[in-house]
Amino acid sequence: MKIFNTLSRRKEEFVPIEEGKVRMYVCGPTVYNLIHIGNARPMIFFDTVRRYFEYRGYKVNYVSNFTDVDDKIINKAIEEGVDAAVISQRYIDECKKDMAAMNVLPATKNPLATQEIGGMEDMIGELIGSGHAYVAKDGTVYFRVKSFKDYGKLSHKNIDELQSGFREIKVTGEDGKEDSNDFVLWKPKKDGEPFWDSPWSKGRPGWHIECSVMSKKYLGDQIDIHGGGEDLIFPHHENEIAQSESASGKSFANYWMHNAFLNIDNKKMSKSAGNFFTVRDISEKYDLQVLRFFMLSAHYRSPLNFSADLMEAAKNSLERILTGVDNIKSVIQRDNKAPISDAELSNLEIAKVLKDKFVAAMDDDFNTADAISAIFELIKLSNTSLNENSTTEYANGLLKVIEPLCDVLGIITERKTEILDSEIEDLIEQRTQARKNKDFALADKIRNDLLEKGIVLEDTREGVKWKRS
């Protein structure tokens, strides 16, 4: 299995630290609002990486944090007049709902930054003691970048050419920096902000130290894979390396993986441009299985363009797979116990070759696009070979190949019964048109079909209202 390592900028053979086990850390969201579709890409991709390792027999310890203390969380809490913890817990809960709808498996651990403050203070203290960090007069603690000779090795930046562009919250006393590239490990509190006592000041940790500490606590000083979006390479992941390796004296992560950006209609997603979509927005029109399938339709290191046309294409492609699986299951239900034929045995050998093609694609830096192509070939083989005389043994053989591969990609092959809001509205419109055309039989059928799916219609003077029973 080969993985493209951002650190070396080349594909490398995966060799785990501990045989048969994988330690993975993936940076999670800052929970101040509903997650957007840009957040969804790393969630879906690294969940797929985790699933594939498990498919290959590895035991995966998968840790992904929630950043639950941040300026954006604090500002929202002030706007609403509530504690910051109320905001963060609200959106952690909503994030978990969206992740479940995208069939993202629960992480082994989802640590919260605010629950790991003690560990952060310990690591900061160690860094100060070893000369890698220093305390400014106002109680801000900075990491001394020049003390870490390998700084810049992940982003391939020359430290002498770096400009101070770190994502850190400006604080009074920043003049206390020894060097413009030094970054914050601990910042003194401002009025109205949550804070914790520390040996240096009442305040809170910097963003970068949070992940170093949570990774160390739950995975150890050295991990196999660290992942995230490519926007995190610098400064966040660069700073994590500096902190973790300065504290432990060991190499932090053996493989660094980063997914590329998601654009909307070939433009950067932004609220001001009016092209900003939350996962919840997408769920109003599509089953989130479609979003997941769309995200995996391109290689993770390739920029991905989101558009209505491409989502429709993903919906249709996913439907081809699900219909193919339905077809196999219908043959199984016919329960033809006749002996499997030579032709069917030959087709099962072809299916095994296609399974190997799927594995080869995933072994090549998790090429999900090519892996999906292998599944389509399996579906084509199934569709063209199954007929009224097909044996149950043959159909079961096909299903045993296809379903585990779908599961690796997080494709749920069992049909969902819940109907989407947009589908309900479409059916109500069809029913309204049928009534105008005096086709009352069709109108009644639509009403009854919706009722069977738990949707109750009410005809009012203002129009048709509906609710889920």
Regions found by a protein language model. Give the residues of each.
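Short phosphate-binding/catalytic loops that engage adenosine nucleotides
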Residues: 58, 132, 455
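Structural preference for alpha-helix termini/caps and helix-kink/transition segments
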Residues: 268, 275-469
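Short Gly/Ser/Thr- and Asp/Glu-enriched loop/turn motifs at secondary-structure junctions
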Residues: 106, 136-138, 459-463
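Alpha-helical recognition segments enriched in aromatics with Gly/Pro capping
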Residues: 1-32, 47, 118-329
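Short, glycine/charge-rich beta-strand/loop segments that flank catalytic centers
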Residues: 66-70, 92-95, 105-120, 138-148
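Short catalytic-loop micro-motif centered on adjacent basic/acidic residues
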Residues: 62-63, 108-111, 226-228
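N-terminal, positively charged nucleic-acid-binding surface of large information/translation enzymes
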Residues: 8-13, 17-105, 462-466
